[in-house]
Every structure is written in C-alpha cells, then in structure tokens.
Amino acid sequence: MTGGQVKVFGKAIQTLSRVSDELWLDPSEKGLALRSVNSCHSTYGYVLFSSVFFQHYQWSPSATITDSDIPLNLNCKLAIKSILPIFRCLNYLERSIEKCTMVARSDRCRVVIQFFGRHGIKRTHNVYFQDCQPLKILFEKSLCANILMIKPRLLAEAIALLTSNQEEVTFSVTPENFCLKSSSGESLDLTSSVYSEMSFGPEEFDFFQVGLDTEITFCFKELKGILTFSEVMHAPIAIYFDFPGKPVVLSVEDMLLEASFILATLLDYPSRTSSPQSLRLSQARRSDPTLSGAQEGKSRVSQTPESISRAAPKRLFPKDPPDSSSAAETRRASASQDDISEVPESVVSDMEEGQSPSPLRKFSCMFFGAVSCEQQEHANHPLGSLAVASDSEQDASG
C-alpha cells in the first residue's frame, strides 16, 4: 500500500474501533475484510477491501478439508488496542510513508506490518492474533422499505448541531420530508437539555425512497464514525431501514471497497402510531370497499388527560351501533384476543396497575431478537431477527 491507501485503511480501523475492542482480519480470494461486533451484539461493522485496492495482494488458504478440498481462510482476531496505535497519525503516515506491507503468518500467529519511509527508515510492528472464526451477518438490505442516499458532508453539517454528549439520534421520514433530531429519551426537559432538529427535502438526496412513514432511534457514535470514513472516500452514504426494532444499515460502496454498519434501533412500542400488522390491515381495507364501509361504523374511545386510548377493534360487520356499555365490554374482551392488530393503550395501563414500572424503550438485539414483554403479549407477529433467541434469553424475557 502507498501512503494514500494507508490513510484509507487506517481510517477503516479507527471507524471499527468505535464498535468493539476486537477486530477480525478475514482474508479471502475477493480481498481483505475487516469485521467488528460489540459485546451485546447490537452493532456490527464490516469493511471489505477488494484485491485491486492494494498494489499487490496475495492470498492462499491456511488449510483445506481433505474430503472436499474446501479452502479454510485464515481468521485473525486482534485486540484493537494493539493495532490502533499503529494507524493513529494518518496524516503523518500519508506524507512520510512510501510503502506499507502486511504479512499474516499462520505458523507464528502474528501479523507483521512494515512501514518504509523516506531516507531508508523502516518500522516493523509484530501484532499477535488469535485464530478465531469471525461473526458474519446475512441481512438483505435491498428489501428495506426506506432507502436514502446522501452526501456525507451534508449529513455531517446536520449532526454538528447535536451536542457532544448525545448518545442517540433519531431519523424521521415521510415521502415529503426527512428529519434528523436529537433523541429526547423518556422526557424532554427544556430547562436542562438542548433539543436540535433539522429537516431535509427529497431534492437534497441523491436517492430518496420512502415506502413507510417511520421514526427510528439508534446510537450516535457509530453514525459519526462512518460519516468520517465516507468523507475520506468521497463517496455518498446509503441508509436502509424499515420500522423501529429492525436494524438500520449505513453503507458506503466504492469500486475498491465496501463498508456496512448494521445498528440495532430502539424499540419504542407505545409511541408507534401504527404497527406493520395494522399497516397491512389498513391497506387491505382500503383495497376492499366493503371493509372500508364497515370501518366507518367503528366507535371511538374518548381521550382523557390520564390515558389516550385508540379505537378498539370490533367485528367487521356490526349489526347494531354499539353503545357505551358494549364498547367497554369490547375493550375488555379485546385484551384476551390473539388475532387483533392493535391493543388499546388504556387496557394495557389497567393490566399494569400495581406492578413496578419497567422501561418500554429498549434496544432490540438484532442477533437474538430480544423484545419487550409487552410486545410479546400483544403483537401477533414479533419483529424478525437474524437468529433464534437462546434458551436463557427466552427464560429472562418470559
């Protein structure tokens, strides 16, 4: 690698250091992949440098399976604190380094990194690794309902409005608008906190596709890291997401490399105006004039300062207009049904009286599908996850 390539490679390591204290070097025939995943499995980072990114790239399998001759890749698990100081001063390396070589020695379990500078100066670093299989995530980002592509400089200017101690950021999208705002958490205290919000029109994006009006909240630290990396690459950043609780993907693609960050989003069930089941049900009712006519006969529940209730679902073809007493009975009966799309929040609040309050805002672990107990009781179709929950997590969530 030359000095400019060392800067890009080092910036990728710095970006992945925001995710975890461990880094995997995963060489293959396609190129060199850098992987990182945090301890709670809520953030996954992946950067693939193609073979043409390097001036010279040579790969050979560490071993082969005798029966089928399947090559086995060399998996190098490094401590981020051992490799990060080597690529800390990137501007200095870009100016002073003429060539950089990296050689992985499977027999000695170490990676040898050499810098060749001016005036014959040579620096050698021996980084020992552990042969460990990296975690690989299969997530089809192209199937997401919302796909946005924007220049990193424009998004970086927007997040500059957020405070430095901000931990989470919220994206809110509609077909006419994109809104970036600081997450207010459980409550917004205007006397002791700063709330920032910025809106963009579709014309500000290179690509703007919104198939689902939604609002997602995720960690702010990883967003800043991939924005810095995309600015170095001078490539637009693509954002793929659906609804709260499903992962959001931040991706940067170039002819020489591909970078993707998969982040878990905050599952805020009470604040969601419509679940995916209710969206599909509403679309089916709009397509059927008979069902849409029956929808107009549904009664509405009065709103009080203590609790705001949604309309309780009833039969699609009511014979008589329900009175107030039948509406109350329907609300009580709807709590025991399993095939409804929504549950009135007043019923949930009545069921939770006398119990200790538990936070409903929770990050959904995208690998083990950890969701709140309230959603498991009232949602007919739980959010999709990339792997089945373990037995210990099922006992804890129950």
Curated annotation (Swiss-Prot):
Annotated family: Belongs to the rad9 family.
Gene3D superfamilies with a match to the protein in the record: 3.70.10.10
**Stored SUPFAM superfamilies:** DNA clamp
Q: Name one GO cellular component term.
A: nucleus
For biological process, the GO terms are: cellular response to ionizing radiation; DNA repair; DNA replication checkpoint signaling; mitotic intra-S DNA damage checkpoint signaling
Q: Which domain of life is it from?
A: Eukaryota
Assembly notes? Interacts with HUS1, HUS1B, RAD1, RAD9A and RAD17.
User: At which residues is Phosphoserine found?
Assistant: S349, S358
Q: Where is the composition biased (Polar residues)?
A: 272-281
- The name this protein carries in UniProt is Cell cycle checkpoint control protein RAD9B
Q: Which UniProt keywords apply?
A: Phosphoprotein
From the UniProt entry, list the residue stretches annotated as the region Disordered. 272-359
Under Pfam families, the record lists: Rad9 (PF04139)
Comp. bias intervals (Low complexity): 324-336
Task: List the InterPro entries.
Answer: DNA_clamp_sf (IPR046938), Rad9 (IPR026584), Rad9/Ddc1 (IPR007268)
